[in-house]
């Protein structure tokens, strides 16, 4: 998941699905923003400084009470133009403006040749523009102890370890290699 870089407050990934993009410290996109959490997080960590900027425009802010909350909390930098926002976040103005114009063309064409994104909302072309400094964060763990249907912990040979029980996120769980948002509710419902 994505967290605000200074406070570690969770920043909803849904904004990327709604049309936000991520740019790195060079002012460039670097990933299909709606990829799986593990892939996007790894790409974000690999960027200079291990952070990126989540970029939205006023049209997105008007439609989202979540973005409005982020603005009120002071998480956002703001600019009346692409160049002003670039200056506010410390990235090259020309590069950032080119990135934004290229993204808007991707939205118009419904095609992202560079990163293969297939989810397009509206262009990010309504001033002012906002950016939140984000980084990868942890809010759920996967993997762990193997249990049976009685929640008894099993050793590496699959045998019950007498008197040892486990439940919730400490167990191997049902998620496999990646977790879908909301799936952890099953853990909470079953195990309390």
Annotate each language-model stretch with its function.
Residues 1-191:
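Residues forming the flavin
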């Amino acid at each position: 998941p994505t967290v605000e870089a200074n406070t570690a407050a969770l920043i909803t990934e849904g904004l990327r699905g709604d049309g936000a993009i991520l740019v790195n410290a060079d002012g460039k996109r670097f990933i299909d923003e709606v990829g799986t959490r593990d892939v996007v997080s790894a790409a974000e960590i690999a960027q200079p400084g291990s952070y990126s900027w989540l970029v939205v425009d006023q049209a997105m802010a008007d439609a989202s009470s979540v973005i409005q909350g982020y603005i009120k909390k002071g998480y956002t930098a703001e600019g009346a133009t692409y160049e002003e926002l670039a200056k506010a976040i410390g990235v090259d103005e020309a590069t950032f403006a080119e990135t934004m114009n290229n993204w808007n063309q991707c939205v118009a064409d419904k095609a992202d040749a560079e990163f293969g994104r297939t989810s397009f909302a509206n262009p990010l072309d309504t001033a002012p523009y906002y950016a939140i400094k984000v980084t990868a964060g942890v809010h759920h763990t996967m993997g762990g102890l193997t249990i049976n249907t009685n929640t008894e912990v099993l050793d590496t040979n699959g045998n019950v370890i007498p008197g040892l029980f486990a439940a919730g996120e400490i167990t191997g769980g049902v998620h496999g290699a990646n977790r879908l948002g909301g799936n952890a509710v099953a853990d909470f419902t079953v195990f309390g």
